[in-house]
Amino acid sequence: ENVTGDKAGKLDYSYLGMEGVSFIPIKCEDEYAPIDVKMLENVDALIVEYQDSGSRYDSFTNALFLLFQTIHLQKISLSVYILDRSNPCGRQVEGTVFTFADEWAMGIPGIAHRHGLTLGELANLFYCEIGAKFPLHIISYLVRSATQYMMPWSIPPHEDVPGLFTSQFYCGMR
């Protein structure tokens, strides 16, 4: 499947020169629904590359959590590679943390409103929390502080968060 376009869920990977590589969108219409196992059939490795917004409301982060649960519970033999980037809102942690008994609609239970973690750190947290055994590889994306806020986003983390500066306001930064 080729994915083209320039909005969340509609991406153009032609610049990568990766003919013959399939790209699978993991975000579903219902972002809290389990991932369809059929999507993972005949997949050798999964590369996750997107910029987290720094907020627990990030729908792609929710999809990653559900993806990890699916791989773990279905015992799918799949290596997962996370391209880790800095958190656009920095390391500050604030806001409420709710339990699994609370409603899922506000994001992943156990994660603070502004979590202060990178995508790789979130992935490692999810992996450990569910007791996963599949191969997880976190690849650091080094960013110099001078260019940190000018990083291009290849995939917006949410339809309502089109850019890096939006994420700082979205999480309630003053």
PLM region spans:
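Short acidic catalytic loops
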Residues: 45-53, 81-84
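Glycine-rich oxoanion-binding loops at beta->alpha junctions
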Residues: 15-42, 55
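Conserved anion/nucleotide-ligand pocket segment
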Residues: 103-174
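Glycine-rich, charge-decorated loop segments at or immediately adjacent to ligand/cofactor-binding or catalytic sites
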Residues: 5-8, 81-103
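Glycine/threonine-rich flexible loop motifs
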Residues: 52-64
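N-terminal beta-loop-helix "entrance" segment that forms/cooperates
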Residues: 2-20
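Short, well-ordered, mixed-charge alpha-helical segments that flank or form enzyme active sites
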Residues: 32-33, 54-57, 87-93, 145-149
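A short helix->loop->beta-strand "cap" motif at the edges of active sites that frequently abuts
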Residues: 71-79
